[in-house]
Amino acid sequence: MAVERTLSIIKPDAVAKNIIGEIYSRFERNGLKIVASRMVRLSQADAEGFYAVHRERPFFNDLVKFMISGPVMVQVLEGEDAIRKNRDLMGATDPRKAEKGTIRADFAESIDANAVHGSDAPETAAVEIAYFFPELNIYTR
């Protein structure tokens, strides 16, 4: 497997629960290095731009409203098969369907307030990382 980078967002519901450290520990225990991170309060334009691919979906406005409701932690994760590992750690989008021990099963409240976001493919990861870290040099530890 190749070393990959993926974007992860700890959403407002999880930030409000003060579980950033627990989520970071799960990343690191599973071989994912945090090579860039920052806390940000998304504007409506930021959230709409990031989730533009979902603009025509019925949940778009609720998603944007939720993502601007509080600060988020945005991080770049790096490691072998990072995209798949992160998605496995997150669990199913609907926390009621997420496997026990996943971030969403343990911490998410609903399909809307589902604690985390993660890139779903290498192409998506590249676009999402550039969205939040456009001019940042990211270095491997």
Swiss-Prot record:
It is an enzyme of class 2 (transferase). Belongs to the NDK family. Major role in the synthesis of nucleoside triphosphates other than ATP. The ATP gamma phosphate is transferred to the NDP beta phosphate via a ping-pong mechanism, using a phosphorylated active-site intermediate. It catalyses: a 2'-deoxyribonucleoside 5'-diphosphate + ATP = a 2'-deoxyribonucleoside 5'-triphosphate + ADP; a ribonucleoside 5'-diphosphate + ATP = a ribonucleoside 5'-triphosphate + ADP. The active site is at H117 (pros-phosphohistidine intermediate). Transmembrane segments: none annotated. Disulfide bonds: none annotated. Its EC number is 2.7.4.6. This is Nucleoside diphosphate kinase. It comes from Nitrosospira multiformis (strain ATCC 25196 / NCIMB 11849 / C 71).
